[in-house]
């Protein structure tokens, strides 16, 4: 039966059998949320109820009484084998106590207790991502738990992202094409971005004819991605690369057509916080296309503006306004918005320096950004010389 039903019966009758039934009832869908539930659960806890302590901790955390929740869950961890207790403790250790090693140990314990739990595995990976663990280590763990990956689109997308970061473009593409994705709130555009990156990576290693076909393929999303293009996605990077290939062939008419398509869009440098913000690399490719079209002064002005933005905003104190638009990342573990802004400004500086021909400055800016976020895709590609 429902655990809470038996806890209330125990409170009213004092019948120990009701406490036994409450403690042995399935816990999966028990979510105490009312103030009177606190009384019933506290009574059970005072008489040795271990699962009651777990439920009470969940309710108290929701009421911002996290210190009491921590004490209850740490008591539970000594007495019952429930992975969620350790998972919940990881939230306290990281978000409230700012103790990343302790949080990671708790998440590892939770996953070790049930290695079939794809959600806990994903959350463990997100903790490592948040704390800037090397992406190669995360990829190895993914490859050790491949049966879990297709169970969650967010987890599978993270795996494909790591494959692209590692330069395994063919494997990333194959994984994308053999899975049917379902977009989630805030995750819009994530898997199409990896689809495009995989094809762009394959194009860079191919002969010109094959590269052109791959880039043109990337302009259209297959049905299994589950979504179309976001408003404002102008494929500046793809068209700029296509233009370069046509120019290399000497086909100036098609090159100019591609460069004009690449040069479209507003030049509005922002913090790129939300999923539908214009990525700065797209504005970089638009500026490159302008240069290819002979509009050198405007291109140089835009490249310089990237650097000006970085220098003006790298020390900004960032805040999020939760209204209408979802954030692109899963935020169970609290991120550092100011760190994200510093990394973003490193990318801005690197893009501007690349455009102005200062490759060493671009590389140094990218390395500074990677020191704080080693999984940033564009910074990795700048360091590798393949943006």
Predicted regions and their residues:
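Short coil turns that delineate tetratricopeptide repeat
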Residues: 1, 46-47, 80-81, 115, ...
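"A position-specific structural signal for the A-helix of alpha-solenoid helical repeats
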Residues: 8, 55, 88, 123, ...
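Hydrophobic/aromatic packing residues within the alpha-helices of TPR/SEL1-like helical repeat arrays
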Residues: 41, 73, 107, 142-143, ...
